Amino acid sequence: MDSESANSVHPVELCVYSTLSSDLDSIYQAISELRRSQAMLLFTIRKIRDSIKEENDSLYEIQDLEIPIQRLNDLTKRANNLQRKYDLLKEKTSRLAKKEDEE
């Protein structure tokens, strides 16, 4: 009987094995589903990131800003020149007004 009991599986052991194996199968399946879900999320996040990056690049390209910046610099120079001319004219006008007052 010792040899038979040594080779046979005890019913409790069989129940424990059955319970554990079914739990392990469900855990493995859940992990598998989580991995698939994670892969899909990563793929979606990468698509969104790339889309945002493309939109950002198209909105803020340096080449698109070069022309307005150059135009702004030109307008600033013109405004400074006009301010200098205005100051000179104002000074000449005040000198002429003083000369007229003296005469």
Swiss-Prot record:
Location, primary (coarse class): other
Coiled-coil segments on the chain, per record: 69-102
Localisation per UniProt entry: Endosome
Key words, A-Z: Coiled coil, Endosome, Transport
GO biological process terms held by the UniProt record: endosome organization; regulation of protein localization
Domain of life per record: Eukaryota
GO cellular component: BLOC-1 complex; endosome
Similarity comment: Belongs to the SNAPIN family.
Subunit structure: Component of the biogenesis of lysosome-related organelles complex-1 (BLOC-1).
Stated role: Component of the biogenesis of lysosome-related organelles complex-1 (BLOC-1), a complex involved in endosomal cargo sorting.
Protein name: Biogenesis of lysosome-related organelles complex 1 subunit SNN1
Gene: SNN1
